[in-house]
């Protein structure tokens, strides 16, 4: 696979976009699919400021003409792994932007491999533990009291050097004592160590509350049958054929995500191509017990509160607010890449 990419643009209108999403190269305003290309040896590249600001796109190996206006040429001096693409462009401070990973972080214990979920809506849920039975609560979501941690997991205690990045079932917060060690220091999929990182408390807070039009760029929903929370990118332009309603339901309940708004997989592909990020309501883990799956979502920050607690972003159908929680609880992780 290629390790680097060079690009030149001959001519292109500034109102058009070129993006890669869900196995398709998309172009135009409104975005249209280009079906005549092959998609091996993909690479991420930034634009030459002729597209929308900071648009991330992916192009194929060798030379290809796109809509008779864009000339893309790959030119590399060596072999290497293809890095992962990011989703959207999001301000997390007055002078910093990030792009989100394509899915929640996952870890396979038997192979010591870190990876991202294939789709943004994917989550492991009650299968984070083995043994026991699933109890479905129509208000709060699915619960399961297991007997052991599964081989593949995506709910982690707060990451310190003493806990194998939070892959631990200890319920004692003292066992998670120490400074944070970012999950992004690992090799994740084909990405080199330190490619990705965890948002701090201040960055999550800025994304949720402070950036321009923050309240208009977040909302609960159900995507492809999965409950969760959507964050829209800074320069949001809603694609044709779909609409987005920001905000939250007035009450907390599993069914109220879908009652607020829903998107099919096809509709979501348009939103994702336009930079939308979806955080599934994956519940949380305490020891060998998993709770509130599809009722709530909980996403770690990199910031400690004290020796026993750290900050995270929890959400339900009724709201999303930063709180401090026990380090020993297992929560979801969605990493970002600095731009």
Predicted regions and their residues:
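Collagen/collagen-like triple-helix sequence repeat recognition
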Residues: 43-78
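Bacterial Sec-dependent N-terminal signal peptides
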Residues: 1-17
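Short N-terminal segments immediately surrounding and downstream of signal-peptide cleavage
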Residues: 15-30, 87-95, 233
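Coil residues (strongly favoring Ser/Thr
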Residues: 36, 47, 62-63, 69, ...
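Short amphipathic beta-strand/extended segments with alternating polar/hydrophobic composition
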Residues: 26-32, 61, 247, 312-315
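A short, compositionally biased
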Residues: 11-15, 42-45, 83-87, 308
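Conserved positions within compact, well-structured domain cores
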Residues: 77-339
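N-terminal targeting signals for Sec/Tat export/insertion, comprising classic cleavable signal peptides
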Residues: 21-46
């Amino acid at each position: 696979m290629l390790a680097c990419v060079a690009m030149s643009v001959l001519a292109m209108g500034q109102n058009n976009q070129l993006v890669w999403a869900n196995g398709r190269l998309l172009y135009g305003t409104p975005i249209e699919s280009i079906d005549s290309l092959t998609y091996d040896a993909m690479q991420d590249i930034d634009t030459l400021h002729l597209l929308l600001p900071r648009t991330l796109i992916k192009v194929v190996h060798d030379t290809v003409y796109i809509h008779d206006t864009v000339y893309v040429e790959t030119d590399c001096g060596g072999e290497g792994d293809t890095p992962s693409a990011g989703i959207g462009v999001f301000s997390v401070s007055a002078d910093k932007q990030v792009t989100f990973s394509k899915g929640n972080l996952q870890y396979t214990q038997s192979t010591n491999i870190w990876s991202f979920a294939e789709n943004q809506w994917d989550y492991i849920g009650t299968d984070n533990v083995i043994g026991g039975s699933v109890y479905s609560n129509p208000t709060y979501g699915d619960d399961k009291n297991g007997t052991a941690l599964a081989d593949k997991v995506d709910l982690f205690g707060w990451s310190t050097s003493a806990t194998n990045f939070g892959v631990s079932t200890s319920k004692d917060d003292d066992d998670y004592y120490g400074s944070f060690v970012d999950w992004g220091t690992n090799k994740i999929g084909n990405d080199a160590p330190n490619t990705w990182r965890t948002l701090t408390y201040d960055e999550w807070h800025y994304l949720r509350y402070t950036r321009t039009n923050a309240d208009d760029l977040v909302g609960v929903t159900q995507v492809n049958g999965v409950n969760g929370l959507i964050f829209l990118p800074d320069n949001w332009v809603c694609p044709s054929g779909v609409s987005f309603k920001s905000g939250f339901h007035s009450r907390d309940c599993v069914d109220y995500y879908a009652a607020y708004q829903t998107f099919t997989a096809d509709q979501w592909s348009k939103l994702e191509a336009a930079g939308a990020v979806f955080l599934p309501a994956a519940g949380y883990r305490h020891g060998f017990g998993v709770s509130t799956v599809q009722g709530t979502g909980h996403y770690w920050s990199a910031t400690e509160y004290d020796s026993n607690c750290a900050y995270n972003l929890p959400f339900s159908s009724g709201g999303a607010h930063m709180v401090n929680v026990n380090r020993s609880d297992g929560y979801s992780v969605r990493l970002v890449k600095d731009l």
